[in-house]
Amino acid sequence: MEPQPGGARSCRRGAPGGACELSTTAESAAPMSLAIHSTTGTRYDLSVPHDETVEGLRKRLSQRLKVPKERLALLHKDTRLSSGKLQEFGVGDGSKLTLVPTVEAGLMSQASRPEQSVMQALESLTETQPPATPGPGRAAGGGFRKYRLILFKRPWHRQGPQSPERGGERPQVSDFLSGRSPLTLALRVGDHMMFVQLQLAAQHAPLQHRHVLAAAAAAAAAARGDSSIATPVSSPCRPVSSAARVPPVSSSPSSPVSPSPVTAGTFQSHAASTTCPEQTDCSPPASSNTTSTPGSSPTPRSRKPGAVIESFVNHAPGVFSGTFSGTLHPNCQDSSGRPRRDIGTILQILNDLLSATRHYQGMPASLTQLRCHAQCSPASPAPDLTPKTTSCEKLATPSLLQGQSQIRMCKPPGDRLRQTENRATRCKVERLQLLLQQKRLRRKARRDARGPYHWTPSRKAGRSDSSSSGGGGSPSEATGLGLDFEDSVWKPEVNPDIQSEFVVA
């Protein structure tokens, strides 16, 4: 009997008759080595299991090269690896694969790019399962968390081992959701690059997650875990937007929730005049009712689900900060009500932020307004978004809807912002009018200098007076010529000291 390929013959002495049996070797379990050659001449040696799929190999290369897997194409003996297992294409140990980058050409849907960018950034993270012990960012019995989030669109040098761009073996999703390290994501928003850094912190409010955006200037301190950089304050003195458009935040654990369709949000900076559309495919939370504090009147009607932006500050062109709150979707929570430690939770957090931006109205506040907002806000974050009466308010806010529609003294209302914009526009228009007037005067001076007759300003004034006073005079005076007959119309520009014969000559 010939030995079977891929197997080895082993005989057991205890078997009756000295029978031998075939035992499969561990060759199938051993990893196989692949040589990845790129079109630029770079070579990578990669070890993958024998049952590795094409999608898994592309994901490994995406994490190693920091390139979206949709932009990678693999060739094996002039055959493109599309889907399925590597063995189906004849790939074995020591096989050579060619890595070809995918070039986009033609028209593409602009709405699909941000969604792919978010998913590409999240899929490049490592998702090692965390230990069973709760992390420092775990709140007691709640699916809500507080985040310090740094958002800016300027290219910056990432530092520290927390950046997912540095790849590696660290479980980035687990470390972020357990509060051990911040998470940095590089997102493509149209023609811009947007960097988002999130830091998980404990929140005492049950079933609530609060996102606190810190200044981009404090990025280095935030990466070290300095919690004094962010200002985790709620916004009882600053309305987010109109009462009919702000989505609610349910503070009741028993409120039913249901998924909602995909919504798109925009980051808009009036100072930098840049708009960043974003769209993700994670369903934002939905709540059918809104709870308020005892003694307050119920809301007239339920509003659309989603997060609420409490404050928004523009620190520099392209650098934004603020706070917003929302509810984790039940699909992002485990049986104990804690957030699941996977990319779906992070995607839902980003979707809350991006969905809430289109409901926010008004110009980003300055740092001085942020200090005013901090004085009007309570010392500790409120567990819910129901406004509370402070010294900066003139009127009481009995409900959430009424509180958000009231005009606060800390933040300038929309009319004041529009007045400021109108004043700046008027200044620009007046300056343009002044420049045009100066240009007209210079052009008139050049035209008068090229004319055949040089009229003095006094003679021009005399002509205008004679033309205006042509009532009882002769018809010739009424014509308005206003010629001064005491002086000749034309004077020779010669020196009077010269003798007459030279003048005639």
UniProtKB/Swiss-Prot annotation:
Induction summary: Down-regulated at high glucose levels of 10 and 25 mmol/liter glucose with highest expression at low glucose levels of 3 mmol/liter.
Biased composition (Polar residues): 263-282
Cellular localization per UniProt: Nucleus; Cytoplasm, Cytosol; Nucleus, Nucleolus
Biological processes annotated in GO: negative regulation of glucokinase activity; negative regulation of insulin secretion; proteasomal ubiquitin-independent protein catabolic process
Name of a matching Pfam family: ubiquitin
An annotated GO cellular component: nucleus
Regions of compositional bias (Low complexity) in chain numbering: 238-262, 283-300
GO MF entry, a single one: molecular adaptor activity
Quaternary assembly: Interacts with GCK; the interaction occurs preferentially at low glucose levels. Interacts with the proteasome.
Protein name according to UniProt: Midnolin
Organism taxonomic ancestry: Eukaryota, Metazoa, Chordata, Craniata, Vertebrata
